[in-house]
Structures are given as C-alpha cells and as structure tokens.
Amino acid sequence: MAKDLKFSEDARQSMLRGVDKLANAVKVTIGPKGRNVVLDKEYTSPLITNDGVTIAKEIELEDPYENMGAKLVQEVANKTNEIAGDGTTTATVLAQAMIQEGLKNVTSGANPVGLRQGIDKAVEVAIEALHEISQNVDNKNEIAQVGSISAADEEIGKYISEAMEKVGNDGVITIEESSGFNTELEVVEGMQFDRGYQSPYMVTDSDKMVADLERPYILITDKKISSFQDILPLLEQVVQSNRPILIVADDVEGDALTNIVLNRMRGTFTAVAVKAPGFGDRRKAMLEDLAILTGAQVITDDLGLELKEATMDMLGTANKAEITKDNTTVVDGDGDQNSIDARVSQIKAQIEETDSEFDKEKLQERLAKLAGGVAVIKVGAASETELKERKLRIEDALNSTRAAVEEGIVAGGGTAFMNIYEKVAKIEAEGDIATGINIVLKALEAPVRQIAENAGLEGSIIVERLKNADIGVGFNAATNEWVNMLEAGIVDPTKVTRSSLQHAASVAAMFLTTEAVVANIPEESNNDAQAGMGGMPGMM
C-alpha cells in the first residue's frame, strides 16, 4: 500500500485538529453541569452518555492525520481507564491543554526535547505533591461520597458503599442489568461457581427448583465418577450421619448418577452432584480453593488418591450449600482460617505477578470468593437508553471508589491540581526545560477552567481565585459556592488524579517530539474503478 508523508509543523497541525475534535467532544461532559453526548449505534438505539472513554472510543475521523491525533488522545483515555477506571475526561482535558500550549512553543522555536524534560520534571513534582495532600478513606460515608461524586448520584454512592462493606475491598462487585425500574443490591455470601445440579430430581424445593443442603458434607474430586460402587462405601458412612452430601466432580454419569437420583427419590439419602467449575489448570486451582474453604482434601491422581479409598475426614463441611440449575453456592465453609489466609496471600501474589488482564480478572474473582463473597448491583431504568447510561456511570463510580480505597482522596472539581500549582511553579529551571514546566502549569488550570465554563461561568476568574485559596478550598460548580471540598464531600481518588496527569503528559510529550507522520493512501476500490470506465460499449 502506498504511503503519504507529512513533516514538522504541517504534520503536527494536522494531528492537532484531530486532538481538538475528540477533546472538544469529550470535555463538554466534565463537572456537575457537564452535558451529555449522543452516540449513534448501528443496530440499537443511540447511546446517551457522559463517560469520557466511551465517547473517545467511538470517534473515528476521515482524515488519516487527524485520526492519528485523535487516536493519541484515545490512548490517554484508555490508559487512564485501564489503570484507575475513571478520570478519562480529566486526562483528555489535560492532554489537549499540554499539546496546544506545547505546540505554540515549538512553533516559536522551542526544542521539543527540552520541553519534554520540563514536562517530565513538572509531573514528577506534581505527583509527589498530590500524595502529600492525599487523605486516606476510612469509613463508609467517605466511600459513598466518592461514588456519589463520580456518578453524580447519591443513591449509586450508597449502593457501592454498602457493597464494599459487605464483601470487603477485595470482594467482587458486579454490575448487571435489571428487568425492573429500580436499582438494587444483592449480596451472594460464600463461594459461588457457575455449575448447577446434574439432575432436576436432586432438588429439595420443587417449587423453587433449588437444592438447599444444611450442614452438608462435601466430596471434591477432579475424577469422573461412572461407577456407583466407587463412592458407595463413603455414602454408607454419610447416611449414618443423617446429613446431606454435595459431590463436586469432573462429571457424574452412568449408574453412579442413576443410583444417586433413585436413592434421592426413595428418601434413602440426600445427595447433589455438580460438575467442577472451570477448565484445565484453572479447574484444579478452583477445586483446591473450595477444598481449603471447606476443610476438604481433593481426591486426585496427583496425590495418588482413589475414590474407593476416600474416608470421611477427606470430606469438607459447610454451614449451607444452595444449588440451582445454573449455580452452586457454598456458604460459611469450615476450613482452617490460617489455611484460607495463606491461600488469599498466594492469590494476591499471583495477581501482582501476572501481566494478563484476563488472568488478573479470574484471580480477583477467586480471591473474592475466598475473602468474602460477591455483590451484584442490579441496574434498573425506565428505558434501554437510560439503562445503558446509568450502567456506565455505576461502573465509573465503582472504579473510582476502589481507587480511593487504594491511594486515598484529594479535593475534587479540579481543586487538587490548583493545590499543587505552587509547588510545581517553584521548580528552578532555565530555557526550554522551564518552558516545559510552564506547559504543565497551564494544563493544571484546564480542568477547573472547563468545569466552570460548562457551568456557564468565566473559567479564568475561578482559576485566579483558586491560586490564592487555602488547600482543600474550591469552587462547587453545582451550587456556585466556595467551600472546603473535602468537608463538602466533593472528592476525587488520588489514583485517578495522578493517572490522568501522568498519561496526559506522556502522550503530550510524544506528540511534541513528533517530526514526521506516515499515513496510508486508501486504495481505489473495484467499484470506483469500474464506475470511472463509464460503461464502455462492447464490454461483456
């Protein structure tokens, strides 16, 4: 494919147009009085949202050079979302401000490499200053405040706070769509996995089609159980205890399944068989998790164990097990707490080591099931369009809350950037490095300026007053009042604020040091070529 090239100022200006188009679409959403953006969807109703990363991902420009500029800012939003889960609009506003200011200086003759050094130096000092003014999140109310500010909805903040209180900071909180109008919180305690009973005849409640087992024994194996004789000696001992048994195996089939069902129907004993969760190595790990949680031993060839030789002390126990057609939940397992804590530490170490997002997600799910449980926020709304928009806001709020618990909080509404302004301004430097520091200083004003402008106010006036205000005091654009932002509950997670600044600076520095841009020249399609022939006579 042929290529087209642009150099120096021509290249940077072309890309800047793309940066501005994307950033201008995103930045109208920032702040309590930010607007929504409507996104066209090919097969469904339009999506109305104020989520920065969602808007950024949708933008594809026709001009290849403009599109490359837009893609750079998309990268800022994506990276910030990936690390902190929120703050994508702030990152976009910061990136645009740095690129615009930097380009003015490059056009005036500044050396881009010197500017980059200045930007890096300023950001390093800014991040140190952010951590100095950061405060830990200690209680339920502070967690609720973070969620409420991110989602612009107090009710959402309350749900997230309750969910984190019930399943812990490491717990899994999922967001699902509800079929009703109301949003509600549902907490699944204990370990749940997506495998249900192997026969509907195993249920204990035929109305609800659920098998509820009180104080069950739990047999865990990675083997396939085909012969009833293999488990008969163990079942005879379980019958004498007059307690139910949950069998978790690779599969239960043949006369083993038939006899379990027949004995269940005759009332001889209560047994429920479910397939083991996961596949391959993940299955082994999940079975081991369940064994540690319930105090069982996995019957496996790896340990040289046979089902015929299994004894009662190899079985796990729990306070309760609930099995539906699709899920099995084991509540309050009787495993040794020290063993559970050691397993939790092991999984946390694996999370730190892995680079795979998929593996990290699966490890976090396993961690949550061992550490506390799973909370589900079921999102309700009056229409599909509202449902999608509300779900996106809750996802952002949840990510913000987790970030706040991890690294603490700072004053919100762009105030934190102005609180660190003076420290960055005091950095001693000369020449292009000093100019690079000034680029960051100008960018630190941008979020506050944009929030004020979205509220219909003059941003410059708010910025100048903030430069002289005490740390933590800021402008509440929702009420047009000057308040202590932390006391008023207007806060941002430190991690979100830090990530947005770091990623914006990184992309801006790359942009300013760009000297050539190479774009593909689209190939003329066959249809266009044939149309150009004008239907020549004699053609067959």
From Swiss-Prot:
Signal peptide bounds: none
Record's catalysed reaction(s): ATP + H2O + a folded polypeptide = ADP + phosphate + an unfolded polypeptide
The EC number(s) this enzyme carries: 5.6.1.7
Domain of life: Bacteria
Amino-acid positions noted as binding ATP in the UniProt annotation, renumbered to this chain: T29, I30, G31, P32, D86, G87, T88, T89, T90, G413, N476, A477, A478, D492
Claim: Lipid metabolism is one of the keywords in the record: no
GO biological process: protein refolding
Location in the cell: Cytoplasm
Family matches, as InterPro entries: Chaperonin_Cpn60_CS, Cpn60/GroEL, Cpn60/GroEL/TCP-1, GroEL-like_apical_dom_sf, GROEL-like_equatorial_sf, TCP-1-like_intermed_sf
Keyword annotations of the record: ATP-binding, Chaperone, Cytoplasm, Isomerase, Nucleotide-binding
GO CC annotations on file: cytoplasm
MF annotations from Gene Ontology: ATP binding; ATP-dependent protein folding chaperone; isomerase activity; unfolded protein binding
Chain's role: Together with its co-chaperonin GroES, plays an essential role in assisting protein folding. The GroEL-GroES system forms a nano-cage that allows encapsulation of the non-native substrate proteins and provides a physical environment optimized to promote and accelerate protein folding.
UniProt-listed NCBIfam families: GroEL (TIGR02348), PRK00013.1 (NF000592), PRK12849.1 (NF009487), PRK12850.1 (NF009488), PRK12851.1 (NF009489)
Family matches, as PANTHER family: 60 KDA HEAT SHOCK PROTEIN, MITOCHONDRIAL
Family: Belongs to the chaperonin (HSP60) family.
Assembly description: Forms a cylinder of 14 subunits composed of two heptameric rings stacked back-to-back. Interacts with the co-chaperonin GroES.
Protein name according to UniProt: Chaperonin GroEL
Lineage start: Bacteria, Bacillati, Bacillota, Bacilli, Bacillales
